[in-house]
A protein has these predicted regions:
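Structural marker of alpha-solenoid helical repeat scaffolds
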Residues: 66, 100, 134-137, 176-177, ...
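Terminal, low-structured helical/coil segments at or just beyond the last alpha-helical repeat
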Residues: 160-161, 179-182, 187, 194-195, ...
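Structural signature of tandem alpha-helical TPR/SEL1-like repeats
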Residues: 50-59, 84-96, 118-130, 159-169, ...
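Residue-level recognition of tetratricopeptide repeat
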Residues: 45, 79, 113, 150, ...
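Register position in tetratricopeptide repeats
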Residues: 49-50, 83-84, 117-118, 154, ...
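Helix-start (N-cap) detector for alpha-helical repeat units in TPR-like alpha-solenoids
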Residues: 37-38, 71-72, 105-106, 139-142, ...
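Canonical positions in the second alpha-helix
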Residues: 62-63, 96-97, 130-131, 173, ...
Length: 239
């Protein structure tokens, strides 16, 4: 199944191309170097989803040599930096991607997630709240709601956790995606567990597991969550 992140990025690229070139089909008439850079970005995004970070990095670096301000390349490189633990560099690329194209909401979501990893919890929550207040496209709104739900259900700093709001956000995200996104359903399960509703948590975790096309990694994670909920335990919070 194509990830929500991939769908949102593709949608954003199409929106950007439409704004810049007037219509999507005009891509075939863009300068050769621009087409080459976008093709490299597409390849890098695909390789990153497959876990081939080294190849993704080579392609995105090549794209940025062609056009140092190409926001999709900056966003993808930010994802690579995050995987490498280079959080400050990732944030810099998110900032620049947003400067080049303020509509790249995915860069803002990635930045919020990185801030959570850096324990900048107040800044992360502010970013989620701001994004949701913008009422972005449905797919992007669902992602923002689900990410905020995860934050409020699992934040290592208990003062930022809000189980009831997390459940509300996660249900809204699942509804937007008509209950077809397994990761969002799992987030709802985690949020229910945070409130102590382990029966609902187990039910939603089982629902996420039953989705067709889930990755082996996600299946492993969902099974671990289900086992915890059946024992009436929350997922461990990483300090």
């Amino acid at each position: 199944m194509i990830s929500i992140r991939a769908i949102a990025l593709f949608t954003a690229i199409i929106t950007w191309l439409t704004a810049v070139y007037g219509s999507v089909p005009i891509i075939v008439n863009t300068p050769r170097h621009q087409r080459a850079a976008m093709n490299l970005c597409s390849d890098a995004s695909h390789q990153l989803r497959k876990g081939d970070v080294a190849s993704a990095k080579r392609n995105v670096d090549a794209a940025l040599r062609i056009d140092p301000k190409l926001w999709p390349a900056l966003y993808i490189r930010a994802e690579i930096f995050r995987k490498e633990g280079k959080y400050e560099l990732a944030i810099q690329d998110c900032n620049e991607a947003l400067r080049q194209y303020p509509g790249c909401v995915e860069a803002s979501l990635l930045r919020a997630s990185i801030k959570m990893q850096l324990r900048q919890y107040e800044e992360a929550l502010k970013e989620y709240n701001y994004l949701i207040s913008l009422h972005p496209r449905p797919v992007t709104l669902a992602r923002a709601l689900s990410d905020r739900a995860w934050f409020q259900a699992t934040c290592p700093n208990a003062s930022f956790r809000n189980g009831q709001q997390a459940v509300k956000d996660a249900k809204a995200a699942c509804s937007i995606m008509v209950w077809k996104d397994e990761s969002m359903i799992d987030t709802l399960a985690v949020a229910c567990a945070e409130t102590g509703d382990f029966d609902s948590a187990a039910r939603y975790a089982a629902q996420a597991l039953a989705m067709k096309g889930i990755s082996a990694h996600d299946e492993k994670v969902f099974r671990e969550h289900l086992a915890l909920f059946q024992q009436r335990k929350r997922i461990p919070v990483t300090q």
